[in-house]
């Protein structure tokens, strides 16, 4: 088995190593271990969007975990994707589910879970968990 990343894995990546600006494009590269179930977790404490009613900023710790099938999510594209919500007026529950849907559309993972822990607003914190399981796949 090859130890380093083959050049063909890099050929589809258009955001890595380029100027950073918000983008709704999620990029992937091939999973070199598709025969194994393993969990990839990506986290950020810097997710922001805004309340669609007040325009006030909402801050969240965001955790995306998935068991890849054929593809792996490229982290810079995820960073730019999440950045694109910075000024988006969207409810917590909706944005968490949209992120899950977009990650699933990009990856077609065996399993994926997005957890968003939003900061306290009006004395209440909100945690939203959205989960996807590929039809026919069962967690070992």
Curated annotation (Swiss-Prot):
It catalyses: 7-aminomethyl-7-carbaguanine + 2 NADP(+) = 7-cyano-7-deazaguanine + 2 NADPH + 3 H(+). GO terms for molecular function: preQ1 synthase activity. GO terms for biological process: queuosine biosynthetic process; tRNA modification. Substrate binds at residues 73-75, 92-93. Pfam families: QueF. It is found in: Cytoplasm. GO terms for cellular component: cytoplasm. InterPro entries: GTP-CH-I_C/QueF, NADPH_dep_7-cyano-7-deazaG_red, QueF, QueF_type1. Keywords: Cytoplasm, NADP, Oxidoreductase, Queuosine biosynthesis. The active site is at residues 51, 58. The keyword Cell membrane does not apply. Its main location: cytoplasm. Gene3D superfamilies: 3.30.1130.10. It comes from the Bacteria. The keyword Cytoplasm applies. Its EC number is 1.7.1.13. Pathway: tRNA modification; tRNA-queuosine biosynthesis. Disulfide bonds: none annotated. NCBIfam families: QueF-II. Belongs to the GTP cyclohydrolase I family. QueF type 1 subfamily. Catalyzes the NADPH-dependent reduction of 7-cyano-7-deazaguanine (preQ0) to 7-aminomethyl-7-deazaguanine (preQ1). This is NADPH-dependent 7-cyano-7-deazaguanine reductase. It comes from Syntrophus aciditrophicus (strain SB). The gene is queF.
């Amino acid at each position: 088995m090859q130890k380093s990343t083959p050049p063909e894995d890099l050929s589809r990546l258009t955001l890595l190593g380029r100027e950073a600006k918000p983008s709704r494009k999620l990029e992937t590269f091939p999973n070199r271990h598709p025969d194994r179930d393993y969990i990839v977790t990506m986290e950020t404490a810097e997710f922001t969007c805004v309340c669609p009613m007040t325009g006030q900023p909402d801050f969240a710790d965001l955790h995306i975990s998935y068991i890849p099938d054929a593809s792996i999510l490229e982290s810079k594209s995820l960073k730019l994707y999440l950045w694109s919500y910075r000024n988006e007026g969207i409810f917590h529950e909706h944005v968490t589910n949209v992120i899950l849907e977009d990650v699933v559309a990009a990856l077609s993972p065996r399993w994926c879970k997005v957890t968003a822990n939003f900061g306290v607003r009006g004395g209440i914190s909100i945690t939203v968990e959205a989960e996807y399981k590929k039809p026919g796949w069962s967690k070992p």
